[in-house]
């Protein structure tokens, strides 16, 4: 075992340039980090720059460095999707060869009718929408009628929004459990049901931190399952536990936002364990990518960058820190959907003198294979370990 603890940070949606197959996903020219760097005045990421972020691809104001503190490269997604679930499942060794069902015209009336009958409330919306736009459009009507807001996106999701003072949280969660049950049927299949509670008044609604995801279980064991089976820790922070439907999770820690996510992974660095601590920093995607807000996205990246020294300081000699992403979400791209991009790969431990180029990894699963290799557990079916290059 080269490292007794691996800390994995997924910067949700922080892509680093279009993949060769991007045109098939209508994403030619997408470059999340590159376009943010170009658009945001005063943008700089000095700590990620020292780790080698600017050595991976050209980024304005994030120049390459002669001796990066981390090994660096980028990873390509091979699965047939560009959503959170697909990206995370591939990281942990699964190849999603069939795209998940999406509902560009809303959900079938048969599903909605049964859903309404089961929950005892009517449905508003039932269409593709941005989470903030649909609250502006239907939030007031929801408050007057008590009907829940149902919407989807370009991803395979069934989202239910409700005001916490109109529909109590426990009822909303029960409503989503009903939706999860119904959407496990092949004819209505979705990957995730998401509870989207909000507060506020018309014209000033805001989503709360009480979001809850109900994901389908991975179709095969992931590297996290292998760690758990071997008696090792597999700590899931933020929405990680939801993404894997609690499979292969030995401890689950909820988070409120990106900075809380950093606080929580720092907290696990103070724990004594052998295994993986895995966090998803969702704000980049949820608050800024989908809303096409490059300034907000850039600010969030700079806030995360400012926390890097704390993370490096908290690591022990035999710890490995990996920073990556799960897909892109270019905030200057057309539409409001994720984008098909390479993701950055930074791997740091205290023994590195000068980071080496890890190349373009052929699949996100190379990361899962590396973690499996380190802990001596069964390797995933796809992915090549780069442990010997660290």
Swiss-Prot record:
Pathway: Carbohydrate degradation; 2-deoxy-D-ribose 1-phosphate degradation; D-glyceraldehyde 3-phosphate and acetaldehyde from 2-deoxy-alpha-D-ribose 1-phosphate: step 1/2. Its EC number is 5.4.2.7. It comes from Brevibacillus brevis (strain 47 / JCM 6285 / NBRC 100599). Mn(2+) 1 binds at residues 12, 326-327. It is an enzyme of class 5 (isomerase). Mn(2+) 2 binds at residues 285, 290, 338. It catalyses: 2-deoxy-alpha-D-ribose 1-phosphate = 2-deoxy-D-ribose 5-phosphate; alpha-D-ribose 1-phosphate = D-ribose 5-phosphate. Belongs to the phosphopentomutase family. Isomerase that catalyzes the conversion of deoxy-ribose 1-phosphate (dRib-1-P) and ribose 1-phosphate (Rib-1-P) to deoxy-ribose 5-phosphate (dRib-5-P) and ribose 5-phosphate (Rib-5-P), respectively. Binds 2 manganese ions. It comes from the Bacteria. SUPFAM superfamilies: Alkaline phosphatase-like (SSF53649), DeoB insert domain-like (SSF143856). It holds the Pfam family Metalloenzyme. Keywords: Cytoplasm, Isomerase, Manganese, Metal-binding. One of its GO terms (cellular component) is cytosol. This is Phosphopentomutase. GO terms for biological process: 2-deoxyribose 1-phosphate catabolic process; 5-phosphoribose 1-diphosphate biosynthetic process; metabolic compound salvage; nucleotide metabolic process. It is found in: Cytoplasm. Its main location: cytoplasm. One of its GO terms (molecular function) is manganese ion binding.
């Amino acid at each position: 075992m080269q490292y007794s603890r691996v800390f994995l940070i997924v910067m949700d949606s922080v892509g680093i340039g279009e993949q060769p197959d991007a045109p098939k996903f209508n994403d030619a020219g997408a470059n999340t980090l590159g376009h943010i760097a170009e658009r945001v005045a005063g943008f700089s990421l000095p700590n990620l720059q020292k780790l080698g972020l600017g050595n991976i691809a050209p980024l304005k104001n994030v120049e390459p460095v002669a001796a990066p503190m981390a090994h660096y490269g980028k990873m390509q997604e091979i699965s047939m999707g560009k959503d959170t679930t697909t990206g995370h499942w591939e990281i942990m060794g699964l190849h999603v060869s069939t795209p998940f069902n999406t509902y560009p015209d809303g959900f079938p009336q048969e599903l909605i009718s049964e859903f309404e009958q089961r929950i005892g409330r009517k449905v508003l919306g039932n269409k593709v929408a941005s989470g903030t736009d649909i609250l502006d459009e239907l939030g007031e009507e929801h408050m007057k009628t008590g009907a829940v807001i149902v919407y989807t996106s370009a991803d395979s999701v069934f989202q239910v929004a409700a005001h916490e003072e109109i529909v109590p949280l426990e009822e909303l969660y029960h409503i989503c459990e009903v939706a999860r049950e119904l959407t496990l049927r092949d004819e209505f299949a979705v990957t995730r049901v998401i509870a989207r509670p909000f507060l506020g008044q018309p014209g000033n609604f805001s989503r709360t931190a009480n979001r809850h995801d109900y994901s389908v279980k991975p179709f095969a064991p992931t590297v996290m399952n292998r760690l758990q089976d071997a008696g090792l820790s597999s700590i899931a922070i933020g929405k990680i536990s939801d993404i894997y439907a609690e499979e292969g999770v030995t401890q689950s820690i909820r988070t409120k936002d990106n900075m809380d996510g950093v606080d929580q992974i720092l907290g696990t660095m103070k724990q004594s364990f052998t295994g993986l601590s895995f966090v998803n920093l969702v704000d980049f995607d949820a608050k800024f990518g989908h809303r096409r807000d490059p300034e907000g996205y850039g600010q969030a990246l700079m806030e995360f960058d400012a926390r890097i020294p704390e993370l490096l300081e908290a690591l022990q000699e035999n710890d490995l820190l990996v920073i990556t992403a799960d897909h892109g979400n270019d905030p200057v791209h057309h539409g409001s959907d994720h984008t098909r991009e390479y993701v950055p790969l930074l791997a740091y431990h205290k023994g590195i003198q000068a980071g080496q180029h890890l190349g373009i990894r052929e699949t996100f699963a190379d990361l899962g294979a590396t973690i499996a290799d380190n802990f001596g557990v069964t390797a995933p079916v796809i992915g090549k370990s780069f442990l010997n290059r660290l």
